[in-house]
Amino acid sequence: MKENIQTTLFQLLKQKIAGEESIGNALSDLLSVSPDAVYRRYRNETPLTIQELKKICNHFEISFDALCEMGDGKVVFSYPPLNTFDFSLESYLEGILKAFQKLKSLSSPEIILSVNNVHLFQLLNFPQLVRFKLYFWAKTHLQIPDYKDKHFRHEKTSENAFALGKEILQIYNSIPSKEIYDFDFMRGFMRQIQYYYKAHHFEDPEYALFLFDRMLLMSSHLKEQANVGKKFMFGTQVPASGNSFEMYLNETINSDVTFYFNSKEQQGLYLTHNIMNYLETTNQSYVSDSKMIIDKQIANSSLISIVNEKERNHFFYEFERTIHLFRKKIEADLES
């Protein structure tokens, strides 16, 4: 086997099992060889046999065709297929939690995030907003038949979904992050609420006002985090240490959502895909190129957490002013 294919395969395996167990333990039982024999293959001292390659690819759901085609300008991504979702809040959060648990298991992980419209992790402080976002995705974008004749209505978030969201938030908050925002933050989300109101997709039209009220709480909480430069859950106290939060303002526009992570073991990237799905890769060339771009985004943005109070206040003033404008339009229509 070509050395670069075997090397790439083991890089993908490290990505898939990161933090769960060692390469040696993960493959010794599967291949019926000792951990030492696995590491000889890992170091390219011993080539994998065709049967070993088949077992690995089948077990870890890796495309051998993609491995053979790897080269300059070609990248292997992994993603959760849509057929693995049942479009419940629980199902969606379970996939995100698994990714965060893998990230948290790495040594000294850090995050750099460019936010395009919605910040899902901050949204988790207010589960009703996440539930609406997922419902909109399933009914309007994917047109799932089960949602065709349904109206969105108020439902209490299940205990399981609440626990999943809380665990994701706890991990996200604990990992130092640099985050780039722009003035279009959450504007698309507001238009989605307005669209559902006009299309009579709310069982209770006044629920649209409730969602805008939750957005105002979200703005207040995000601003409080920016003031102190620390992430923490809504309704809790600011932590004495850790949870570092650097908030940057890009005065033009963030064209996409890029979630870059770095640790002592590896660096990688998540990209949004099909609106709310995501792609993941640890391809060194692609990740390095993306890191270079996001570093330039930060250089062209203004730090507004802790410092630059004037710019920070202006950002949140414009954000809340827009929320109030959308809310007042619906409120006036309800009263007419």
Regions found by a protein language model. Give the residues of each.
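Residues that form generic nucleotide/phosphate-binding pockets
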Residues: 12, 16, 30, 99, ...
